[in-house]
Amino acid sequence: VTIKKILHAGPTRLILAAVITLSAACQTLPVATPTTPTVPAEPVAPSFPTPLAGTTAGFVAFADAGTGEAVQQQVADTMAAWTNSGHRVDALVTAGDNVYPDGAPSRFAAAIATPYAAIRSADRPLWVALGNHDADSGYGAEQLAYLSLPAMPYAKTITGAQLLFLDANRPDAAQATWLETQLSAPGPALRIVIFHQPAYSCATHGSTALIDSLWVPILEAHRVALVINGHDHYYERFRSSSDVTYVVTGGGGNGLYARNPSCTGTPPSQATATRHHFLGVEIAGSSLRLTTVARTGETLDQVTITR
């Protein structure tokens, strides 16, 4: 894996965390009320990297977005600018909490249809994992039907990569079996797994013990390229000893959470930022380039992963 760490001075500084020793569980912070920063009228002019040469597929990914408010729209507008600047986007991918506060169908237009209208199309679908705010009130199946998606878990394929969507609201052995079956079958070199509650996190909710025991051993054994999670409203990228990259991308639009500087029990942290953002994923051959883009258009982090 080739890693490029990008630092910014002042308010956009990216904090690189120290290497942390693995242990059984990640220390968590008490539940806190999210804080919403002052929102500028419009994002600043984006400063995107040049599109990856030889790209055969790509997507944008985000989580914890579905408020229907200004910050969500600004993140979506910056995603549209990314798409219009020559970066390939074949799908929009979310790691859950797509419709606040309770996933009600009456909120689908405000939280899903309107914000992403400039990006979504028949050729550029929205593929979602369900978060707790989508599923806990019983509306998860309706959201999947609204987006013409199958029941979870499900798989999607783009050129060069397979995307596997799990329901982390019920991290059970049945899904572990499904995951093992999918990863054991012939397929692209790049396998990307998406679910809501994080395998590893250093913010309010912390790591998810049941996922760590049921799913992480499978992800590690098959050396998946990338795991995309949400639930904690910030950004962090971890890299395990098996060269699996775990990303928390909970900055899609809702209020942000502070990172716990005393966090333990995770793989080494490579980069973190308490910023609203999305991920731009570009695939070329057996490599993917992951670019983390702030709501205001700056590049917060970038890494290339090869399998």
Predicted ranges, named:
Residues 2-15:
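Bacterial N-terminal signal peptides that target proteins for export
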Residues 22-25:
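C-terminal motif of bacterial Sec signal peptides marking the signal peptidase cleavage site
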Residues 27-29:
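Bacterial signal peptide processing site
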Residues 36-107, 169, 174, 201-202:
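N-terminal active-site segment of His-dependent metallophosphoesterases
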Residues 48, 87, 100-191, 203-226, ...:
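Extended active-site neighborhood of metal-dependent phosphoesterases/phosphodiesterases
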Residues 59-61, 92-94, 128-129, 193, ...:
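Residue-level marker for buried hydrophobic side chains located in beta-strands
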Residues 64, 96-97, 131-132, 196, ...:
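Active-site glycine-centered loops adjacent to acidic/histidine catalytic or metal-binding residues
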Residues 270-307:
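A short C-terminal boundary segment appended to hydrolase-like catalytic domains
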